[in-house]
Amino acid sequence: MSEEAAQQHYLEALKLFGEGKNVQAVEAYEKALEAKPDWTDALHGMAMAYSNGGRHDDAIRIGKRIVELDSNDPFAHTSLSMFYQRKGEIEEAEKEGAKARMLSWKEELKKNPDAPPPGPAGSMDVIQ
């Protein structure tokens, strides 16, 4: 499959996801990933579609794959935190959330050396 075809499948997956068609979105993400198996944007989308469809174990599996590919991706850790929380695994959710906060802080330090460190888990107001 060409990279252009993979991009088309990815765009279709985004559309389906936006329409709440999670199963079909996952199928389109799978097609996109056939050409580019390490495409983290598509993996992120697939994980979200799995989670929104109630398939939290699959979402966690894909989230872990993203972390394997890019351990410094704060969004991957944030997503894993959310997936664990939805599954009721609060301790794991907090661990991943802490990793995400620390990675985001390190990125902020590159732009703002005086940025304060992140607070402990639960120190931010989260709207669900």
Q: Which residues make up each language-model segment?
A:
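Structural signature of tandem alpha-helical TPR/SEL1-like repeats
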Residues: G18-A28, G53-R65, K87-K99
